[in-house]
Amino acid sequence: MSVVFRESTERGLLSSVDVGLLAVRDRACLRLLYRAGVATADQLATLIFPSRRTALRRLRRLWQLGLLERAPLAPERGGIPVAYRITRRGSKRLGYVDTRTGGVSRVRHTLDIVDAVCALVRSAPGSVQLWLTEPMTDGILPADIRPDSIVVLQRDGGSAVVCLEIDEATEHSPMIRARLGAYERALAGREGWHLVW
């Protein structure tokens, strides 16, 4: 099934929207979608909104305003999930450079990354202190290492920095071994840094 994002046909004039007047959570949602690329309502309910119902209501409003576009995903079990991403016009209106990428495999990969972060958030609420998406990780580790995400965790017993690599079975084993070796060298001597593949 292909992923086709569509803007709302019922949206009002985007130029009349003052994004500074949006609710704080709505602006946080737009920032997260810009940085992560794409997310579902369930994921956004875990990361930003207080409930799934609120997430669906707020996402629909942002979609109607022309700030978001959405696409149905292949159902995994009952119901058809919907993925959201910021529109080209929405990016421009918010002062962002449009960096969206398409393709079914890229959308699935991005949703899996967001799922991993959501699992960390759900497993220990309040422990995720920082989440850097792939574009934000540039320059943190050596040039040959660019994790899908870096997550900083803080618990009573200590803290950790987790480099997330989501494998979609698109790389051959020699490439994976080379990347694991590069991570081993890059993380050597960095106490508290871990790789989750």
Outline where the language-model segments fall.
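Active-site metal-binding core of divalent-cation-utilizing nuclease and nuclease-like domains
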Residues: A71, R106, C118-V162, E168-A178
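Short, well-ordered alpha-helices that flank and scaffold nucleotide-derived cofactor binding pockets
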Residues: T46, C118, R122, R185
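A short, highly charged nucleic-acid-interacting micro-segment common to nuclease
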Residues: V97-I113
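Nuclease-adjacent, charged terminal/linker segments that flank catalytic cores
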Residues: M1-T101
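A broadly conserved amphipathic alpha-helix scaffold signal in soluble, globular proteins
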Residues: R60, V114-V121
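Catalytic cores of nucleic-acid endonucleases
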Residues: E168-W197
